[in-house]
Amino acid sequence: MSFTVDDRVLALAGIAQALQQVRRIADTGHSDAAAVRTAVESVFRVDASSPQEVFGDRHALKAGLRLLHNYFRSQGQDPILPKLALSVLQLERRFVQEGETVNKVASGIERAQRQAAELGDSGHPDVLANLGGLYADTISHLKPRVMVQGNPHYLGQAGVVAEIRALLLAAVRSAVLWRQLGGSYWDFLFSRKAMIEAVDRQLA
């Protein structure tokens, strides 16, 4: 199956949207519930092979697409977010090379998915705590570590930390998808115009 730049920008939007919520929670202690659910549910769709299967309707990624639209035009408001995204893309490369870690994450995701089904809510605090703990026990030990800055008051709260880690797991999942769709660092150098046009099409 062949994939296009339109598919790849959706995966990048998934990364951007998850990390936007990471930044928001770290600074304010609050998140957008719909964006968090989109991120968590993308983690549960581990066997999906296309961004449509992973994220559903592209409108679920509207915030992420708008972020890409702004950053590709050097209009991004948060200079830290692109640095986080780069760290996630680098971390994904290390993660997929660690077979034992990949297997542990896959098993943990299955358990969290069953929990979400029982609770009837993929964004339930217990589900976020489960996924956050999974990230802490596995991917967080790999380098480069994704360093999240924010308000110490909120970063000292267990629930906030768990939600941030769950969203980082979702960002890594989107990074894996981006690679599976043929994404590479060269895209940002040689396919920038095509990526901008693809983002605009998705937002139309």
Curated annotation (Swiss-Prot):
GO CC list: cytoplasm; plasma membrane
SUPFAM superfamilies in UniProt: YcfC-like
Top-rank lineage group of the source organism: Bacteria
Coiled coil: none
Main location group: cytoplasm
NCBIfam families in the record: PRK00218.1-2, PRK00218.1-6
Full protein name: High frequency lysogenization protein HflD homolog
Secretion signal span: none
Family recorded in the similarity comment: Belongs to the HflD family.
Database matches in PANTHER family: HIGH FREQUENCY LYSOGENIZATION PROTEIN HFLD (PTHR38100:SF1)
InterPro entries found in the cross-reference section: HflD (IPR007451), HflD-like_sf (IPR035932)
Gene that specifies this protein: hflD
Localization (cell): Cytoplasm; Cell inner membrane
Keywords from the UniProt entry: Cell inner membrane, Cell membrane, Cytoplasm, Membrane
